[in-house]
């Protein structure tokens, strides 16, 4: 989802303070403890080449998240069938091999979980990597903090139990934890890792601090060693910047942590007619997309575009077509798809 990072971090509400005080205590979960799982050495994150599939509500919901093209009335079988076609279209149209999906307690702890699993299962069955990320709710709950630990931990217990042994499924404890300070967020991420020691570290995505807008602080925390780090970055965060300024800005958010970092959200308008295959120094978004994709390729970073599919979103790189029961996708901006392919190690550079 698209948010603008604040210059100064907001003050967390009282329950965040209580959480921070409680971090010294052992977290109780229903998942049995095991010896800590160790991550294999990695050289880069280029295997992650994907898109976000989103709820039209930007994934913020106080009820189950419903991905664009799906319905809570769909059975597991129908969800699986629809998702299979959407995933196949992501691969056919974009060459993607990764999809990032939202979850929340309403989705996982309720009746819809049986159907929603069809999305994860369909993607995994086609060889996709699946990043499952927790989103907070709306209104007062949309504050960058875990909404309710009494439902948060049972949610993750259920997800881990279902997918711990599926090596294609990855877990992101929270999307954009901007309500926490850098230290509080690192503490919270460490608590998650301690709660699920049997999950291999290289199956976990630790969000960058703030709006996922920098990974340098989580990268420096030894408690989070072996995990992937997730970065978010958007062109609208600046009114205007040159190509070179964008490159410098993005690299500053990554520091020397590129080998662990996946940009699992980045994006720009795709339905407004911009041509991302030609240099246009006057256009901030053209400068941004070219800088971002060049930088991810240079640093050998994986990237997951936001959004691959979200109904009525001008940033969406795909749009639904055909029979709603047999959905397919069309590309909204081929030049945007070309830049994404370039980030993933294919295609041609922009001639500057």
Language-model features, listed with the residues they occupy:
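Secretory targeting and sorting signals
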Residues: 1-39
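N-terminal carbohydrate-binding accessory modules
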Residues: 14-16, 35-98, 343
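Post-signal peptide N-terminal regions of Sec-secreted extracellular proteins
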Residues: 40-42, 125, 352
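Short amphipathic alpha-helices and their capping/turn segments at secondary-structure boundaries
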Residues: 40-42, 86-92, 119-121, 216-219, ...
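Feature marks short, surface-exposed loop/turn motifs that line or immediately flank catalytic pockets
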Residues: 55-59, 105-107, 138, 177, ...
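Extracellular glycoside hydrolase catalytic/binding regions
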Residues: 64-80, 150-157, 161-170, 174-302, ...
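Aromatic-lined substrate-binding rim segments of carbohydrate-active enzymes
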Residues: 83-138, 149-152, 193-201, 282-299
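Short acidic-hydrophobic catalytic motif
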Residues: 145
């Amino acid at each position: 989802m698209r948010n603008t990072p604040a210059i100064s971090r907001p003050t967390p509400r009282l329950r965040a303070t209580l959480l921070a005080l409680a971090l010294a205590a052992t977290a109780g979960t229903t998942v049995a403890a095991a010896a800590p799982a160790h991550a294999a050495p990695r050289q880069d994150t280029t295997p992650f080449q994907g898109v976000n599939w989103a709820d039209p509500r930007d994934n913020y919901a106080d009820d189950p998240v419903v991905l664009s093209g799906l319905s809570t009335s769909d059975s597991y079988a129908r969800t699986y069938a629809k998702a299979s076609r959407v995933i196949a279209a992501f691969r056919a149209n974009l060459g993607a091999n990764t999809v990032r999906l939202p979850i929340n307690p309403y989705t996982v702890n309720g009746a819809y979980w049986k159907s929603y699993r069809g999305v994860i299962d369909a993607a995994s069955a086609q060889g996709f990597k699946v990043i499952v990320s927790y989103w907070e709710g709306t209104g007062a709950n949309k504050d960058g903090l875990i909404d309710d630990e009494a439902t948060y931990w049972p949610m993750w217990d259920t997800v881990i139990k279902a997918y711990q042994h599926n090596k294609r499924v990855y877990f992101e404890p929270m999307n954009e934890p901007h309500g926490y300070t850098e230290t509080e967020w690192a503490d919270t991420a460490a608590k998650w890792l301690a709660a699920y020691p049997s999950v291999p570290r290289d199956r976990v995505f630790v969000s960058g601090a703030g709006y996922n807008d920098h990974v340098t602080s989580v990268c420096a925390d030894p408690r989070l060693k072996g995990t992937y780090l997730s970065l978010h970055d958007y062109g609208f965060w600046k009114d205007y910047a040159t190509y070179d300024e964008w490159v410098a800005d993005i690299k500053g958010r990554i520091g020397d942590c590129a080998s662990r970092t996946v940009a699992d959200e980045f994006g720009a308008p795709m339905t407004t007619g911009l041509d991302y295959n030609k240099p246009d120094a006057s256009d901030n978004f053209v400068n941004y997309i070219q800088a971002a994709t060049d930088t991810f390729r240079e640093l050998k970073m994986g990237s997951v575009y936001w959004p691959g599919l979200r109904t009525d979103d001008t940033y969406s790189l795909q749009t639904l077509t055909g029979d709603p029961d047999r959905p397919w996708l069309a590309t909204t901006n081929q030049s945007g798809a070309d830049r994404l392919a370039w980030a993933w190690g294919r295609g041609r550079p922009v001639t500057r």
